[in-house]
């Protein structure tokens, strides 16, 4: 089964890990976000990029945009704690239709506290669903979690986090991705970047405006696995327009 995930695991290096395995980056000390751009030439956009993520979503322009067109299919999943986040790699069949293009879900992972903010509000947890089209272009759907009732899908995921960093485990009880999302799929849209090195730009960001809940225990459980916050600070908009 693990062979099925070789591509997904390679992709994870682009989304949640370094472009160069020899370069250590993280969220604390000399490898923290303030230093990413100087750690490697590959990471220069982390310092010089003008369309970086995350952002504080304020004064969004009200505009007509297409509703999210998502399709879900049950399949195999694999969960890994890569030292930067807890990530779930998924098999094919989960798609997003956007701008007349089909994007396939590659993986989803989490940040605590949230990276993006809405009207200056930071949430205790944020999920990123990373989609990729046939040309390699990426779209990220961001989901905010606010403290409240326990989340059944997070409970399923957290119970299966591997004990060791970089250990991948087949998910015995698959996480129901659709059930993880809110019933309302209204969203903010802007152009941004990966929030981890190499901070590549040209990423389509769709931030859902309706949060879902997670219990304080679930939020703390994730934080205890990470041992530190894993959020990049807010980046300047530099004139970018956010639509809603």
Curated annotation (Swiss-Prot):
Instruction: List where this protein forms a coiled coil.
Output: none
Signal peptide start and end residues: 1-19
Q: Where in the cell is it found?
A: Periplasm
Q: Where does Zn(2+) bind?
A: 109, 111, 128
Start and end residues of each Alpha-carbonic anhydrase domain: 23-244
InterPro entries with a match to the protein in the record: Alpha_CA_prokaryot-like, CA_dom, CA_dom_sf, Carbonic_anhydrase_a-class, Carbonic_anhydrase_a-class_CS
Keyword Cell cycle found: no
What EC number(s) is this enzyme filed under? 4.2.1.1
- Enzyme superclass (EC): lyase
- PROSITE patterns per record: ALPHA_CA_1 (PS00162), ALPHA_CA_2 (PS51144)
Give the matching SMART domains.
Answer: Carb_anhydrase
Instruction: Note the SS bond partners.
Output: 46-199
Its needed co-factors are: Zn(2+)
Name the domain of life: Bacteria
The family database entries (Gene3D superfamilies) matched by this protein are listed as: Alpha carbonic anhydrase (3.10.200.10)
For molecular function, the Gene Ontology terms on record are: carbonate dehydratase activity; zinc ion binding
Give the main localization category: periplasm
Q: What is the catalytic activity of this protein?
A: hydrogencarbonate + H(+) = CO2 + H2O
- Per UniProt, substrate binds at 195-196
Active site per UniProt: 84
The alphabetized UniProt keywords are:
Disulfide bond, Lyase, Metal-binding, Periplasm, Signal, Zinc
GO cellular component terms listed in the entry, alphabetical order: periplasmic space
What task does this protein carry out? Reversible hydration of carbon dioxide.
**Family (UniProt):** Belongs to the alpha-carbonic anhydrase family.
> What name has this protein been given in UniProt?
Carbonic anhydrase
What is the native source organism of this protein? Pectobacterium atrosepticum (strain SCRI 1043 / ATCC BAA-672)
Species classification: Bacteria, Pseudomonadati, Pseudomonadota, Gammaproteobacteria, Enterobacterales
């Amino acid at each position: 089964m693990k062979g099925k995930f070789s591509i997904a695991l390679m992709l994870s290096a682009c989304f949640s890990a370094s472009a160069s395995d020899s370069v250590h980056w993280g969220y604390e000390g000399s490898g923290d976000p303030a230093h990413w751009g100087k750690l490697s030439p590959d990471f220069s956009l982390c310092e010089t990029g003008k369309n970086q993520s995350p952002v504080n979503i304020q004064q969004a322009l009200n505009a007509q945009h297409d509703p999210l067109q998502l399709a879900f299919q049950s399949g195999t999943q694999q969960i890994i704690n890569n030292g930067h986040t807890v990530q779930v790699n998924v098999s094919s069949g989960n798609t997003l239709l956007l701008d007349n293009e089909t994007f396939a879900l590659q993986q989803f992972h989490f940040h605590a506290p949230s990276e993006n903010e809405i009207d200056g509000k930071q949430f205790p947890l944020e999920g990123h669903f990373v989609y990729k089209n046939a040309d390699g272009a990426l779209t990220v759907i961001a989901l905010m979690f606010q403290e409240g009732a326990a989340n059944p899908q997070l409970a399923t995921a957290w119970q299966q986090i591997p004990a060791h960093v970089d250990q991948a485990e087949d998910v015995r009880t698959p996480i129901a991705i659709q059930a993880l999302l809110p019933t309302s799929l209204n969203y903010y849209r802007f152009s941004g970047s990966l929030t981890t090195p190499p901070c590549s730009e040209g990423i389509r960001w769709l931030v859902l405006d309706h949060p879902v809940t997670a219990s304080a225990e679930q939020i703390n459980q994730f934080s205890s696995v990470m041992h530190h916050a894993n959020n990049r600070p807010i980046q300047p908009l530099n004139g970018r327009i956010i639509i809603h």
